[in-house]
Each structure stands twice: as C-alpha cells, then as structure tokens.
C-alpha cells in the first residue's frame, strides 16, 4: 500500500514538472514588431531599415524570433504564465539573448548580443 502511494506521488510530481516545463500556450500566435538599435558596443551593428517589421511566433509556449539580417539566426525560448519570456541562440560572436513581456497583444523586449543592443516592440 505504501509503495503504491509513493509511486502515485512520484507520478504526480513528474506530471506537474512536465506541465511547468512546457510554457504557457495562452500567448500562442504570430506577432510583428519593430527593432530599434539602442546601443553599439563593437561598431559592427546594423540599424534596421525604417518601417521594417520582424516576426515573433509563439506555439505551445515556445518562442521563436528570426533575428535577421544582423546575425542570421533564430532565437528560441519559452514564455511563462505571467507573460515573461526569454529566447536565445549562439552566434559566431557569442550568445544573443532576448528577454521580454507580453501584455494582451502587445510585446516589449530587449535583445542583447556581444556587439549590439536592440529593443523590440509590436506594432498593432
């Protein structure tokens, strides 16, 4: 009897842990936003073309942001139930990291790389 109780407890902890690791699907969707260069560290940063919009997608709590043209890479991460998210990828110059928050259908975020800092904001 005690063995079954212990096994049941372990299974329920495992299911709860897996659910927490999945991220929040309530923010699923496709978003378009503007990138603005906010800081140049090493001098090889590109100002995004005026009016250019960049896609950020969320599916089953997985965040994906195509970080082009600068590093030609895709940042990947998770969004939490509170709307906070983080996505990252390795580039040839080091780690590129995006942190942000979703409020309704509005997203604000910052992208930090070894050479450049950008802000990202959705345009509705």
Model-derived features: positions:
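Bacterial N-terminal signal peptides
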Residues: 6-16
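Central antiparallel beta-sheet cores of small beta-barrel/beta-sandwich binding domains
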Residues: 23-123
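Sec/Tat signal peptide C-region and signal peptidase I cleavage site
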Residues: 17-21
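Positively charged n-region of N-terminal signal peptides that target proteins for export
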Residues: 1-4
């Amino acid at each position: 009897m005690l063995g079954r109780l212990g096994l049941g407890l372990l299974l329920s902890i495992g299911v709860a842990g897996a659910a927490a690791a999945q991220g929040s699907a309530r923010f699923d969707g496709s978003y378009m936003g503007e990138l603005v260069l906010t800081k140049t560290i090493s001098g090889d940063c590109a100002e995004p073309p005026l009016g250019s919009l960049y896609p950020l997608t969320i599916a089953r709590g997985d965040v994906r942001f195509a970080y082009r043209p600068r590093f030609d890479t895709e940042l990947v991460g998770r969004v939490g139930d509170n709307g906070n998210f983080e996505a990252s990828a390795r580039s040839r110059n080091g780690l590129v990291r995006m942190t942000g928050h979703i409020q309704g259908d509005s997203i604000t975020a910052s992208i930090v790389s070894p050479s450049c800092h950008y802000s990202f904001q959705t345009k509705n």
